[in-house]
Design a protein with these regions (language model features):
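Condensing-enzyme catalytic core mediating Claisen C-C bond formation in acyl metabolism
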Residues: 29, 33-102, 111, 223-224
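Alpha-helix termination/capping residues and helix-transition junctions
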Residues: 1, 62, 66, 103-106, ...
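Acidic-glycine-rich active-site phosphate/pyrophosphate-binding loop
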Residues: 18-32, 65-66, 123-141, 212
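Beta-strand segments within the central parallel beta-sheet cores of soluble alpha/beta enzyme folds
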Residues: 4-12, 66-72, 107-114, 140-146, ...
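Short, glycine/acidic-enriched loop or turn micro-motifs at the edges of active sites
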Residues: 14, 59, 74, 116-118
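A beta-strand-loop signature enriched in Asp, Gly, Thr, and Trp
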Residues: 94-150
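Short glycine/threonine-rich loop-to-helix capping motif typified by GTGT followed
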Residues: 79-88, 117-134, 152-158, 191
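Conserved beta-strand-centric core segments of catalytic alpha/beta enzyme folds
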Residues: 1-60, 155-225
């Protein structure tokens, strides 16, 4: 918007007993490996880490960027302090507004990095939102939280890096530990690691407590015509 030439964006979070005990009290921790979007999912795995990116205005660029942040949105459905609405209202608004701000069509989205925590409520809610937006054809999607866990305050920064690398390297990441589709939506994520895939547009979701939902849309800048 012409306010800054560049900004460093991202997040970091570290595990501690307080956080672990808090999630345990909510009874949403999986004591084995989490299973995002699977029928048998029981909860999440916590992780820790950091992820940062540099955003630059087009006029300040001195080299070819990895990609463009073409769309973004932050919404709050205020449904519950720790839960998402069953119909996925917050996720629906967040994704819809991010896509609308980018000016691209639904059919142009090549991959979705879903929030996909592995909890029964989150995955059903996000799945409902995906169905509401895309209908029968949902683009290839997966959750990387089966690799890295839910890194909480770092998750959006880390998963933005995954999304940028998806475009830059032509990658689609597998949704680990998936066996059976959840009955709420019947959605089936990508389960194999794919390389050399022409990826032009990636939608990345990060949803938080209190219904605070964010979606980012990254787009290639040098994709062949």
């Amino acid at each position: 918007h012409g306010l800054l030439d560049a900004a460093i964006v991202g997040g970091t979070d570290a595990l501690c007993r307080f956080t672990l005990n808090g999630f345990n009290s909510l009874m949403i921790l999986d004591k084995t490996h989490c299973r995002p979007f699977d029928r048998s999912r029981t909860g999440l795995n916590l992780g820790e880490g950091a992820g940062y990116l540099v955003l630059q205005s087009e006029s300040s660029l001195q080299r070819t960027p990895y990609c463009e942040l073409s769309g973004y949105a932050n919404t709050n459905e205020a449904y519950h302090q720790t839960g998402s609405s069953p119909e996925g209202d917050g996720a629906f608004l967040s994704m819809s507004e991010a896509i609308a701000s980018s000016g691209i069509s639904l059919e142009e989205i090549d991959y979705i990095n879903v929030h996909g925590t592995g909890t029964p409520g989150n995955d059903a809610s996000e799945g409902m939102a995906l169905r509401r937006i895309f209908g029968e054809y949902v683009p290839p999607f997966s959750s990387v939280k089966a690799f890295i866990g839910h890194t909480l305050g770092a998750s959006e920064g880390i998963e933005a890096v995954y999304s940028v690398l998806s475009i830059d390297k032509g990658l689609i990441y597998p949704n680990l530990n998936f066996t059976d589709a959840m009955p709420e939506t019947g959605l089936i994520p990508e389960t194999s690691f794919q390389e050399g895939i022409p990826i032009r547009h990636v939608l990345s979701n990060s949803f938080g407590f209190g219904g605070n939902d964010s979606s980012l849309l990254f787009s290639a800048t040098n994709f062949p015509a």
